[in-house]
Design a protein with these regions (language model features):
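Conserved, well-ordered active-site substructure
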Residues: 111-130, 180-191, 196-229, 238-281
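Short, surface-exposed charged micro-motifs
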Residues: 63, 135, 193
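Short, solvent-exposed aromatic-acidic interface loops
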Residues: 78-81, 150-158, 206-210
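N-terminal Lys/Arg-rich, disordered targeting/topogenic segments
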Residues: 1-10
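Beta-strand-turn-beta hairpins that frame and shape the catalytic cleft
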Residues: 59, 142-146, 197-203
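Active-site-adjacent helix-turn-beta-strand microarchitecture at beta-sheet edges
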Residues: 108-185
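Zymogen propeptides
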Residues: 11-129, 205
């Protein structure tokens, strides 16, 4: 005896919500996809969206992905140039002619850097900040080149953290276990973060709008960037990035509001005692 299998009928009222959910998921995946533009060999640029976690201004996040074996990261301090005052990010780019410039870590009201800072193998600040466990390092002293984001809480990496010519200390945002390394707070600000991805590339992420640190970490960890660990540089008005190469120009200075037009490069006025430049070898 052959039995007919009778499949249950799906009512339209059940199918329609399913179609909507699938459509929303596909659209969400599409909006998360990053469209990379090569700026120079070893340097790519894209824009990540941070909705709904941005609390003020544009939710866009500028993403600069760097191959540390093909580009050179340099720490710059205004005293190296004999400048009477710290430069803003646009002035830094004009002075150094670097392809990209972004802000370094925190500093005191008298512009002294908070933590270790070295440029070209010369110490600009020898006093380590005991609470800061993150360090951006570049140009290994044995001639190995490269760059890394070092988590000083890891003894294996901490012992190697000073064997570099370029050093900028700041605080960790999240570590290799995806653990948040800052206190949760409702304080919002524009953010500059430097991370490493699974391919050991350096990824710089500068927000155009204001996020809490915890929300920003969540957005980055759940992006398609494959980030393994990250440190936070200075935020608020100091969160700055300029990229200039050929016909490509990008500039962001925090904070600015979404209802306002994107600021022109000439409006950047926040002094930055120290910055990180990205150059070709």
């Amino acid at each position: 005896m052959i039995r007919r299998v009778v499949w249950p009928r799906l009512h339209a009222r059940w199918i329609l919500p399913l179609v909507v959910v699938v459509g929303v998921y596909v659209l969400w995946r599409e909006t998360r996809a990053l469209h990379w533009r090569e700026i120079a060999p070893g340097m790519e640029f894209a824009t990540l969206r941070g909705e709904p976690y941005c609390r003020r201004g544009s939710a866009a996040i500028a993403v600069l992905r760097l191959d540390p074996e093909r580009v050179k990261l340099r720490v710059q301090h205004y005293t190296q140039f004999g400048a009477a005052r710290p430069l803003d990010v646009v002035e830094w780019q004009q002075r150094t002619r670097a392809i990209a410039v972004f802000n370094a870590g925190q500093f005191y009201p008298d512009y002294r850097y908070m933590g270790l800072l070295a440029s070209g193998g010369h110490w600009l600040s020898r006093r380590a900040h005991p609470g800061y466990q993150g360090m951006l390092v570049a140009d290994r002293q044995d001639g190995g080149g490269g760059a890394e984001v070092v988590d000083l809480s890891d003894p294996q990496h901490a012992a190697d953290s000073l064997a570099w010519n370029e050093v900028a200390q700041s605080f960790m945002l999240f570590d290799s276990t995806a653990t948040l390394r800052v206190r949760r707070s409702e304080r919002i600000a524009n953010r500059t973060v430097v991370a490493e991805d699974r391919n050991h590339r350096i990824v710089v992420l500068v927000s155009e709008g204001a996020y809490t640190l915890a929300d920003y970490a969540w957005v980055l960890l759940n992006s398609n960037l494959g980030l393994t660990h990250a440190m936070s540089m200075d935020g608020g008005r100091e969160a700055s990035l300029v990229v200039a190469r050929g016909g490509f120009r990008y500039a962001s200075f925090g904070p600015w509001l979404e209802r306002e037009p994107h600021p022109e490069v000439g409006t950047a006025r926040t002094p930055l005692p120290a910055v990180i430049t990205v150059e070709l070898p």
